[in-house]
Amino acid sequence: MNSLLLKLLLCVAITAAFPADKQDEPPATKEEMAENYLKRFYSLGTDGGPVGRKKHIQPFTEKLEQMQKFFGLKVTGTLDPKTVEVMEKPRCGVYDVGQYSTVAKSSAWQKKDLTYRILNFTPDLPQADVETAIQRAFKVWSDVTPLTFTRIYNEVSDIEISFTAGDHKDNSPFDGSGGILAHAFQPGNGIGGDAHFDEDETWTKTSEIYNLFLVAAHEFGHSLGLSHSTDQGALMYPTYSNTDPKTFQLPQDDINAIQYLYGKSSNPVQPTGPSTPSRCDPNVVFNAVTTMRGELIFFVKRFLWRKHPQASEAELMFVQAFWPSLPTNIDAAYENPITEQILVFKGSKYTALDGFDVVQGYPRNIYSLGFPKTVKRIDAAVHIEQLGKTYFFAAKKYWSYDEDKKQMDKGFPKQISNDFPGIPDKIDAAFYYRGRLYFFIGRSQFEYNINSKRIVQVLRSNSWLGC
């Protein structure tokens, strides 16, 4: 509910600015960077009211806490490393919290048929690719609403689109490469609805930064009256996320917000989008779980949680923000401690990862490991370090793979029910940690002692996430 309300707040023109050319300025300290950030996106010292509303709290601290709360960070009021990390991410130039009205539907266009005009083109892409990206970005919104978008060429349009750099006379200068990627203005006359893209960025049509379609779709959300969302998986989240543009689906959070403003589409079957998993949702199901150089990685559709054993909370991020070339909705994953590589499986293919990089020569076919052609996918994979074996689970059977000999062990596959009594056949994920084997089946996890072949305890799957 908070996310939806935030998105329906009225966007306004941005008033504060970073230096137009960062290269001409001496490097800012973290404190200076944070102050500029809070001025620009949280109205530090410019919101027209008392900045210290809470007794005994300095304005900077209050705004910093506001920013930390918005991004779901631990609210410390101090410039801790996680807060600095978020502030340094590339993002949209529109306010997160600050000078906007709580008027909801009045922030929308008062018509359903809108026009747009592309004033100029970036040299980073062929003109046709820019036109396609812009058209597709508008289609993201027209697919879920009654809105239509028509391109015009000579007359002034509702939404004017331009590529520009530095100070471009709208009181919101760009800041050079990185930092702010683009900004847009609320619906209205004049500059209202217009979208500006920083020409100092490198624009692409691939998943490499920065994908024009993804940034444009976000900015056009502002052009239609949406504000930023606190939902990390939403298109209208302030920071840029490196996701595959080919498989992009408008998240449900964005659908709910835009339909509140303009109503539903005329499609007989209303489109739905993916939702962001909640850490303590009792219904969360993991696609795969693996260790990674001392950390734990939990995959859920297009997301992953990254958890250090000594950390109290897990960090949620897009899979493709971590590994840009990796597919989403993977089937299985495990870490080979000998090579320190992560093996990730989807369908009949698997990929080896060394840190953030895909190992050369991958993806490969799973049949190169010795699986019969009847196996179409792997349900779960886990490496048992004390045995030097990797177990692969598929349907009701499992295989044992010798990592030293690089071949399947003889006598396999075997029945899961025979060798792992009490464990259901259909396994979603598995991993080995500190001498215990953990099986994830639906919302439950089974802690298993491989020596005694007994279930030690049954817990909720997300207990690893602090729930």
UniProtKB/Swiss-Prot annotation:
Q: List the disulfide bonds.
A: 280-467
Pro-peptide residues, renumbered to this chain, are 18-99
- Enzyme class, UniProt record, top EC level: hydrolase
**Which residues act catalytically here?**
219
Give the signal peptide, or none.
Answer: 1-17
| One GO CC term, this protein | extracellular matrix
Q: Required co-factor?
A: Zn(2+); Ca(2+)
Q: Which CDD domains match?
A: HX, ZnMc_MMP
Provide any one GO MF term from the record.
Answer: metalloendopeptidase activity
Superkingdom, natural source: Eukaryota
- Which keywords belong to this entry? Calcium, Collagen degradation, Disulfide bond, Extracellular matrix, Hydrolase, Metal-binding, Metalloprotease, Protease, Repeat, Secreted, Signal, Zinc, Zymogen
Under InterPro entries, the record lists:
Hemopexin-like_dom (IPR000585), Hemopexin-like_dom_sf (IPR036375), Hemopexin-like_repeat (IPR018487), M10A_MMP (IPR033739), MetalloPept_cat_dom_sf (IPR024079), Pept_M10_metallopeptidase (IPR001818), Pept_M10A (IPR021190), Peptidase_Metallo (IPR006026)
Q: Where does tissue-level expression of this protein occur? A: Expressed only transiently in whole animal, at time when tadpole feeding begins.
Major localisation:
secreted
Residues annotated as binding Zn(2+) are 92, 218, 222, 228
UniProt record similarity statement: Belongs to the peptidase M10A family.
The name this protein carries in UniProt is Matrix metalloproteinase-18
